[in-house]
Amino acid sequence: MIDIGAAALNEALIAQSIRPLFSRALASGRPIYLANHSLGRPPDRVVEDVQRALDAWYRDMGEAWDEWLAARDRFRALTAQLVGAPSGDSVIPKTSAGQGLRAVLNLFDAPIRVLSTDSEFDSIDFILRVYRDKGRIELTTVPARAEALIDAMHAGPPQLVVVSTVLFRSGEIVAGIEDVVRSARAAGASVLLDVYHHAGVLPLDLAALDADFAVGGSYKYTRGGPGACWLYVHPRNHSRRTLDTGWFAKDDPFGYERPDPPRFAPGGDAWMESTPPVLAPVQALAGLEFTNAIGAVRLREYHLAQKERFAAQLAQRGLRVEGAGPQFGAFLSLAHPEATRLSAELMRRGVKTDARGDRLRLCADLLNTDDELAAASQAVAGVLDKA
């Protein structure tokens, strides 16, 4: 899809080789888009890919499954490459990260102790609280710090630890996540990492981290839209059985045999469920190929420099933001009690941002120009002056 060699990214190279791949998303008249940490901007090729999958349906009807399943397997392989999974069969397509979490929670036959943090994304937090209220888990939450998690493990060993590697409100990277995983494994606990704000903007090697599970998706930084999510299952857990299953987890889904006990597919395919959505993996392919072609290391180098320039422009206007340093992920954030209202006012001024709680979140990416960031800085300053 893209071949720009190994050169460091710069605005001239991006204008020549990358922006033309996004002509639809960059059409004139659009707001300055600084919500790249939320819904990523898709490559033009997404339209062609989805149309091809639909054409197969119209043309081939039931035989379209061959093409759809090939696209699904391509999605799994590309995601494995992105996150450092040992093979594509360790990546289980899901429609949401929450669906992946439920599959892991439903591994356990009896109520279990779950350790998490007070900084998880709303869906993860909500699911854990519902499982707690249903008597399915005992839930302990601590601050999102490695020391707090490890201390809590020593106080009462959990069966499952659920923690983000990058926090969704502030973009802060949770330092010492390797120590958390090691301590959990030593205590006999499984670990599920939420890497949604990590994959695609920071180098990631799940195999090296040795986490049991991880959840993420293509909605944000890999530009694949909603529904193209996944659960990573470490190979040592391929033989474990969750209640979240279905006929695609059988050893021969289209054989229609019913052995008793059920026979599961080999490897990670045993974690599949029932009939999957077919367009979500298709719509994610172009963005995954694009991200892998550039590489997380090169993207991170560019984004760090870009964040620092953006933060400096805001600082020149008297605005203090968090997130510019290497201890943060992809976006800047500005603490303000009326962050949601500020985001709405910025949209009226032609700058698309978002807010989570008291945080106004601002995320440039390689499609944003320095001129756009200068204009956005002026708009943010104007909105705050008015406030």
Label every model-predicted segment:
Residues 1-387:
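Pyridoxal 5′-phosphate
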